[in-house]
Amino acid sequence: MKLNVDLENHSYPIYIERNAIQKVHEYIPVSRKIAIITDTGVPEKWVNIVKQQCPDSFICTIPQGEPSKCFDQYKKLLEEMISHNMSRKDAIIAVGGGVVGDLAGFVAASYMRGIDFYNIPTTVLSQVDSSVGGKVAIDMGSYKNIVGAFWQPKTVIIDPNVLSTLSFRQQHNGLCEALKMGLILDDHLVSLFEQETLDIDAIITRSIELKRDVVQQDERESNLRKILNFGHTIGHAIESAYGLNTYLHGECVAMGMLFFIEDEALKQRVLNIYKKLDLPQVPDYDTATLLEYVTHDKKSSHKTVSTILVKQSGSYIIKELSFKEIQEVLERGPYEK
């Protein structure tokens, strides 16, 4: 299946197909120097399949995990590219999850003022969400995605077969972002999670269609695209304060969504899905600590936070909440009846 992302200054295809990783040479011009950026968590067989199709390529491997989205790894990748005499006509292919895509994309955006970037996401989380849209970034200390850019890929290749090597926890972590998409935009997508057997292909495809539609309307997150931050305001705070070595990103987003689902019947429906996915509960937290992270989040402006509220599955409300109101939400907690 091929979807097109049509933007004002740049459009690109998304290929969603089993065994698509075997066809990289058909989807990407490979007759140039290519840096393949991956991490230690990606099985070598996927990386090697890509490399075998790119005759003049080299592999850059970063340590697995969020801590690699940092200036040190960013600098090392730039040095590696310089040592291989890469030019503006060369390209980067990311083979990995969201961390690899974010870091590789930011390197592509800044090396020689920008070179071609291709993304082959290998996790559910990156396939349903982060690989599409052009948001690339690195962290600074415990502040997530604080340094970054908008740099659209030239092509995205999504092969559900590569998910077979992931643990169930990693798969379910990624599905949280797909569920988020359904809660704000499409109740049918939510209903896919309530089926006895999860149809991963259907969930991925519908999530990408929804993400594509939002990005086409608001490429640079000036208005509509903010809805994709549902669950991230408090989710990022939990991840930064407690979760970088404990919880996965999607798990934190799932926690964050609970604070802003305003219908108790819907919240119970969502909690039933969480139980099915074996997601962790919101940990005990210090309100002041989380509030500190919220106030430094890039979604905050002056003394308010642009917040997404959900009262009915498939729809949303955007509301500016004061820091005081966020404090009250935190004090109330996610499970209050």
Task: Map each language-model feature to its residues.
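Active-site segments that bind and position negatively charged phosphate/pyrophosphate groups
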Residues: L192-T289
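C-terminal charged capping/lid subdomain of soluble metabolic enzymes
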Residues: S11, C176, Q268-K337
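A glycine/threonine-rich phosphate-anchoring loop and its flanking beta-alpha core
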Residues: P13-Y15, I21, P29, F106-Q195, ...
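Solvent-exposed alpha-helices and their adjacent loops that cap or buttress functional pockets
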Residues: D6, N85-S87, S110-Y111, D139-M140, ...
